Amino acid sequence: MASQSQGIQQLLQAEKRAAEKVADARKRKARRLKQAKEEAQMEVEQYRREREHEFQSKQQAAMGSQGNLSAEVEQATRHQVQGMQSSQQRNRERVLAQLLGMVCDVRPQVHPNYRISA
């Protein structure tokens, strides 16, 4: 009976040690999963930062050249407007005199296609 009781005690202790080993293994597995998840998250963040930096540099390059083009177009437009204004100032009096002459100096004439029928 004592040997049977001692055998039961050994089995209980062995079962307890096995349960502890299983619990430790589960804890290690949970730690490994957590660590792997953190590493994967860090890799994703690093990749995202690299792609964002790449995008920003490409966008800056595209917008920078576009900004130069818009400045050139604006400067050309200003130059053309100034040319038109100076041309208008130079020719204003002559055009007004010509226009007034055409309106005020009326010379009545019979149209060449008009047929006098009598």
From Swiss-Prot:
Lipid bilayer topology: Peripheral membrane protein
Subunit structure, interactors included: V-ATPase is a heteromultimeric enzyme made up of two complexes: the ATP-hydrolytic V1 complex and the proton translocation V0 complex. The V1 complex consists of three catalytic AB heterodimers that form a heterohexamer, three peripheral stalks each consisting of EG heterodimers, one central rotor including subunits D and F, and the regulatory subunits C and H. The proton translocation complex V0 consists of the proton transport subunit a, a ring of proteolipid subunits c9c'', rotary subunit d, subunits e and f, and the accessory subunits ATP6AP1/Ac45 and ATP6AP2/PRR.
Disordered: annotated segments: 25-90
Protein's GO biological process: synaptic vesicle lumen acidification
Stated role: Subunit of the V1 complex of vacuolar(H+)-ATPase (V-ATPase), a multisubunit enzyme composed of a peripheral complex (V1) that hydrolyzes ATP and a membrane integral complex (V0) that translocates protons. V-ATPase is responsible for acidifying and maintaining the pH of intracellular compartments and in some cell types, is targeted to the plasma membrane, where it is responsible for acidifying the extracellular environment.
Keyword field contains Ion transport: yes
A Gene Ontology cellular-component term: vacuolar proton-transporting V-type ATPase, V1 domain
Keywords (A to Z) from UniProt: Cytoplasmic vesicle, Hydrogen ion transport, Ion transport, Membrane, Transport
Subcellular localization(s) per the UniProt record: Melanosome; Cytoplasmic vesicle, Clathrin-coated vesicle membrane
Compositional bias annotation for Polar residues: 57-69, 78-89
Name of this protein: V-type proton ATPase subunit G 2
InterPro entries: V-ATPase_G
